[in-house]
Amino acid sequence: MSKNSKAYREAAAKIDAGREYTPLQAAELVKETSSKNFDASVDVAIRLGVDPRKADQLVRGTVSLPNGTGKTVRVAVFAAGEKATEAEAAGADFVGTDELVERIQGGWTDFDVAIATPDQMAKIGRIARVLGPRGLMPNPKTGTVTNDVAKAIEEVKGGKISFRVDKASNLHAAIGKASFDAKALAENYGALIDELLRIKPSSSKGIYLKKITMSSTTGPGVAVDTHITKNYTAEA
């Protein structure tokens, strides 16, 4: 939906630009203003009161969304032997070691999440320049470098997402699909906010949640009340 299109203008007209909505109200508006041509992703953009140039304020982590993401997550697992067998049994889409590295060196990145056992990280270092910029590099902090590959696969396929603040102090995350009911979206939103508050850097001063906007992939943004940090599915 182009911002210059009639459909976009009509959708934007349904939103009070000077108002902050409850998470549930925002989810309802996002659903109402989303394109009807496809099942759009529902995203949140959050401006945090942190300075990501400081190591102790680089907000990053993971959260399991209670209602999943609505996406089919393709998982590549770097593992050998027994761990490779476990990964295959757990539903990994691609499993291997050197052969996976070689495919990626050749330009292939047709997966959404990469998981690796610790003993494979030296090999993965050869493709860090490919995986890193795409947000695909396995990392112990996000639970994607682990010997418990079955659990990691179950989590990412079940709705576990990663997030990280960017250089401009903004954080973006997908919390579901426009086909979700509004309550499910509000619950997923709440899980993300709860986790962000849990890991708030102690050195962060002033307002932490500065601005939050919820939108579909192509729809207009809806401002969410940053003061609501519980009862996310309440009407008002």
From Swiss-Prot:
Assembly: Part of the 50S ribosomal subunit.
Job of this protein:
Binds directly to 23S rRNA. The L1 stalk is quite mobile in the ribosome, and is involved in E site tRNA release. Protein L1 is also a translational repressor protein, it controls the translation of the L11 operon by binding to its mRNA.
The record ties this protein, via PROSITE patterns, to: RIBOSOMAL_L1
Q: Which GO terms describe its molecular function?
A: rRNA binding; structural constituent of ribosome; tRNA binding
Query: A single GO CC term, please?
Result: large ribosomal subunit
**What protein family does this chain belong to?**
Belongs to the universal ribosomal protein uL1 family.
Q: Name one Pfam family in it.
A: Ribosomal_L1
- Name of the protein in its database record: Large ribosomal subunit protein uL1
Organism field? Corynebacterium efficiens (strain DSM 44549 / YS-314 / AJ 12310 / JCM 11189 / NBRC 100395)
> Where is the organism placed in the taxonomic lineage, from the top?
Bacteria, Bacillati, Actinomycetota, Actinomycetes, Mycobacteriales
Give the keywords, sorted.
Repressor, Ribonucleoprotein, Ribosomal protein, RNA-binding, rRNA-binding, Translation regulation, tRNA-binding
UniProt-listed GO biological process terms: regulation of translation; translation
What's the name of its gene? Answer: rplA
